[in-house]
Design a protein with these regions (language model features):
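Signal-transducing coupling segments at domain and membrane junctions
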Residues: 2-9, 14, 31-57, 61-73, ...
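Metal-dependent catalytic cores of enzymes that make or break cyclic nucleotides
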Residues: 4-8, 25, 48, 65-72, ...
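Interdomain signal-transducing alpha-helices
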Residues: 21, 25, 54, 83, ...
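Short amphipathic alpha-helical signal-transduction/dimerization elements
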Residues: 22, 34, 88, 100-111, ...
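Regulatory loop-to-helix N-cap segments in sensory/regulatory domains
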Residues: 40-41, 61-80, 84-102, 194-195, ...
Length: 315
């Protein structure tokens, strides 16, 4: 029936007739599997299906590695496809042609999935490298971007955001301070309070970050996290003095995560504040500086053990 489930069967690498097809790269016809010593006999008790005959073909695709020169793709066997128990007689060359066609389509799908995974991993690694370069410029906030990203994800989960949105939020939060790459090192690494001019220079980093990333099409949904994480509900934030609903959800979430991490982390001019004190302060500022729903989600995430401060991690 349409609801029938096929048991999961794992054949050890190199075993079975399908293993022989994968290792050799050849199409294998077997009219009587029980007369073939390569037959994987443990399959039938698991599947409940008695195999009499079969045909096995390798899944062959072009191995493409990101970062390699064009033209470097080489044929690669990534698996195998097997058909069993032809109803009327033995398997034919026509059956082999059909199975090879199906195998090529399956191999293409698998290869696309792998390339997507590789590209996504490369993309995330590149972002991590960019963030690490910012942390290297500002030693007093080492690990800040990673923590803000993790806090933002925890808030997003408490707010029941979809996995796709949370993935975008994770990246946007990770990149929220990327604009500091345009701020002089003398300001970033200054061990003490900044002058008014230095503060005004530092306030440019959200706009700098948004400008850097605005032409990266893959990041267009994440840019509000970069541009708006210092905006306040009452319009007293920067750089654009946005108010209320003018501030995006990403901007609101990252604003809460950013301040929570800043206040619960050590700085050269003060020690980390107590978490309870910080949460009370942020609750008082809800509706003026912070979006109340985001603050409540932060509190729930912290009480659920989903958020670890800098001090927690060092313990």
């Amino acid at each position: 029936s349409s609801e029938a489930q096929v048991p999961v069967l794992r054949v050890p690498r190199g075993q079975g007739i399908i293993g022989a097809a994968i290792e050799s790269g050849d199409i294998i016809f077997v009219p009587n599997v029980h007369a073939d010593e390569r037959h994987f006999k443990d399959a039938e008790p698991i599947t409940g299906i008695t195999t009499t005959s079969l045909i096995a073909v390798p899944l062959i695709t072009q191995a493409v590695q990101l970062g390699q020169e064009l033209g470097s793709a080489q044929p690669q066997i990534i698996g195998g496809l097997e058909a069993i128990n032809r109803v009327d007689g033995y398997f034919t060359t026509e059956d082999a042609d059909l199975l090879q066609t199906l195998a090529k389509q399956a191999a293409t799908v698998f290869q696309i999935a792998k390339l997507y995974g590789d590209a996504n991993e490369l993309f995330l690694d590149t972002i991590q490298a960019m963030v690490a370069s910012i942390d290297a410029k500002d030693p007093y906030t080492n690990g800040h971007s990673q923590r803000v990203s993790e806090f933002s994800v925890a808030i997003g989960k408490q707010m029941k955001l979809s996995p796709e949105i949370i993935h975008q939020l994770r990246i946007g939060a990770l990149l929220h301070d990327i604009g500091k790459i345009g701020i002089p090192d003398t300001i970033l690494s200054k061990p003490g309070h900044l002058t008014e001019d230095e503060i005004n220079t530092m306030k440019q980093h959200p706009a700098i970050g948004a400008n850097i990333m605005q032409n990266v099409r893959l990041l267009r949904n994440e840019i509000p996290a970069l541009a708006e994480h210092h905006e306040h509900i009452d319009g007293t934030g920067y750089p654009n003095h946005l108010t209320g609903d003018q501030i995006s959800l990403f901007g609101s979430i990252v604003a809460v995560s950013d301040v929570f991490d800043a206040l619960t982390s050590d700085r050269p001019y003060r020690a980390a504040l107590d978490v309870e004190e910080v949460l009370n302060k942020m609750q008082k500022d809800s509706g003026s500086h912070f979006d109340d729903a985001c603050v409540q989600a932060l509190i729930k995430a912290y009480l659920a053990g989903e958020i670890k401060t800098q001090k927690d991690r060092a313990a």
